[in-house]
A protein has these predicted regions:
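A short acidic/histidine/glycine-rich donor-binding loop in glycosyltransferase catalytic cores
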Residues: 136-142
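Short alpha-helical
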Residues: 32-33, 128, 147
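A charged, aromatic-enriched C-terminal amphipathic alpha-helix characteristic of glycosyltransferases
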Residues: 15-16, 143-146, 150, 157-192
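Conserved catalytic-core segment of nucleotide-activated headgroup transferases in glycan assembly
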Residues: 5-80
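Active-site-proximal region of nucleotide-activated glycan assembly enzymes
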Residues: 1
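Nucleotide-sugar-dependent
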Residues: 79-117, 123-131
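Anion (oxyanion) recognition and catalysis
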Residues: 43, 115, 134
Length: 192
């Protein structure tokens, strides 16, 4: 199983109070080449989305708000939302295309961003990061973006608070370089 990347910052992130009904966050490269699925998000859904990143090259439906571009060192404490979506590719039904299929093998940087931002993750069930998310109880998995509305309705307030608690713990680990230290210690142990 895949682990997670640390997310080192010069400043500490305070505990952030999130609400489960706040908009879903999508951060990263927003161009239609990498995130073609964004063009297929339906405006009539009850889901509100906040976009962060560069490359936005199409008009947005009313339920999607573009929040701008931030440097990786500055965005973590500024993200406004209730969940962070990890999804790439051409389609909303599955992670397709080169970028979508890559999520089966990749640990996306945005997952670490969402964790240090204390945002519960929504990830594809086929992604390499899905087992990490479920094991650490920091989010949920979906087969299709169309599943999000129903999945979120099933999340109880106490479930969301547990995810928040787990994210605060994990956030501190990522911010302090715990996962890199673990890898280095494993390498040293193997060479001893």
């Amino acid at each position: 199983t895949i682990g997670i990347f640390d997310y080192l910052l010069n400043e500490d992130i305070k505990n952030i109070e999130r609400k489960k009904n706040d908009p879903i966050v999508i951060a990263g490269n927003l161009s239609s080449v990498k995130a073609k699925y964004l063009k297929k998000l339906l405006p009539e859904k009850n889901i509100k989305i906040n976009l962060y990143g560069k490359g936005l090259d199409f008009d947005l439906p009313k339920n999607i708000t573009y929040k701008g571009t931030f440097l990786p060192d500055n965005i973590a404490g500024k993200i406004d939302g209730g969940y962070g979506l990890v999804w790439d590719g051409n389609d909303i039904d599955k992670c397709s295309g080169v970028y979508g299929k890559y999520l089966k093998y990749n640990n996306p940087h945005k997952a670490s961003l969402y964790i240090v931002s204390q945002l519960p993750l929504i990830v594809p069930s086929t992604s390499a990061i899905s087992k990490f998310v479920l094991k650490n109880k920091i989010g949920l998995t979906i087969n299709s973006i169309k599943d999000i509305d129903n999945k979120l309705k099933q999340i109880k307030e106490e479930d969301y608070k547990e995810m928040q608690k787990n994210l605060r713990i994990l956030s501190k680990k990522l911010l302090s370089g715990t996962y890199l230290k673990n890898v280095v210690n494993e390498i040293i142990k193997d060479w001893s």
